[in-house]
Amino acid sequence: MINMLPSSWRAAPRPALLGLLLFFCAGFADGALMPFFPLWASSEAGIPVGAIGLLFGCYAGGELLAAPLIGGIADRVGRRPVLIASSLGVGAGFLALFFVHGVAVTAIVLLATGMCESVLHPTILTAIADVTPPSAHPRWFSLARVSSSAGQILGPACGALLALVSLRSVFLAGGTILVLGGIVMFFALNETSGIGHAAGDDRLDGGDDEEEGLSALLPAFRDGRLAKLLLWIVVFEVAGNWIEAVVPLYAQDAGTLTPSGVGALFAYAAALTVGLQMLVIRLVEVRSALWLTVGAGLATILAFALLAASPAMLTLIGAVSLCSIAQMLVGPLVPTAVNALAPPARRASYMAASSVAVDLKDSLGPSIGTALYALAPRLPWIAGIPLVAIASLGLGAAIGRARRPSRPTEDDATPQLGSAVENYR
């Protein structure tokens, strides 16, 4: 594992290290929020199970509303101000959840929080890509997942302790850590846009910088390969999200786990990612995209099969373990492929489009998953098996096509594209 890390942390680009820190903060906040939100909504807030997914949908809905307007804003105003504003905005939204009462106000807060979050993760990845060479992107994106997962260990663990007092208090912890992350970015982060742009890239910047509007901010409408890639990402992530969204209800209704036990379960899943992600990247570097996505699909299918068989403790542990392995396989694969497709002047826009596709799981995943669960407790797992099988094949094929140059006449861009995705053949 040591060989996978940069040879010297002191020599590593400072913005990339700060990006890892912000991923940790965001992972902590998500880890503190996600496992406990359904439990808080159904117990303390008195919200019907079938409506919990709609509140999740408000969070992701804010991202979808904001993406066409501000999805590529970091390409125009810079990475630094976007990271500061978005981290403070998301943190303030989580803090507000501690104080609000009522479904309507909660929905408004989640909508506003989602709007701020729409640019947080993609801009972090963009800043990392700005200051690291394409050949190092897979490892840095894997480190980003490790940092996020480290936060997701402490988040549920902290949430499990706070849940003993009040489920609402987990929002306070998640919001505080993100606000602190935003303050650190304000004092320590330098602007990264323009770093790593070769002289030959200026001709790409000139035409694209003049484009405005929806087509410039959502490149999926202009890049057919990216659109196909994002479609399969959405399908795969939505189905995979059912484990995170439905397992807390499934385990509690079966009497298997308490709210604190749910937090411990997801903390374990995050710890597994921290321990194995940098080892899995060795496998990622020597296997084809189709091999990796099929492996992730098989792991998710087996997790669904275990959950459909029984809500016992061992099956819950096995299911979240398999889900973590699946995410380790495809997690670094997707941003690397998207970054390879992106023109330098639209890197943040492409990352934002990818992030929106992934974040659809936070609306469609819980909405569909909890609706299926309301019909029958095992229905999400049974329905998810064929869906994941199809999505894993489609995603592997789409990522494989991403390694072919999209602009063969642009000699300067082609080598960069090929090298960035070469590790994922």
Regions found by a protein language model. Name each.
Residues 30, 112-124, 323-334:
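Core transmembrane helices of Major Facilitator Superfamily
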Residues 81-95, 291-305:
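Structural signature of the two symmetry-related core transmembrane helices
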Residues 110-150:
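Cytoplasmic helix-loop-helix junction between adjacent transmembrane helices
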Residues 36-50, 245-261:
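Short amphipathic helix-loop junctions that connect adjacent transmembrane helices
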Residues 66-78, 276-289, 373:
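Helix-to-loop junctions at the C-terminal end of transmembrane segments
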Residues 60-68, 152-153, 270-278, 362-363:
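Residue-level signature of mid-helix packing/kink "hotspots" within the transmembrane helices
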Residues 346-374:
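A late C-terminal transmembrane helix in Major Facilitator Superfamily
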Residues 1-13, 190-230, 416-424:
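Juxtamembrane intracellular "pre-TM" segments in multi-pass secondary transporters
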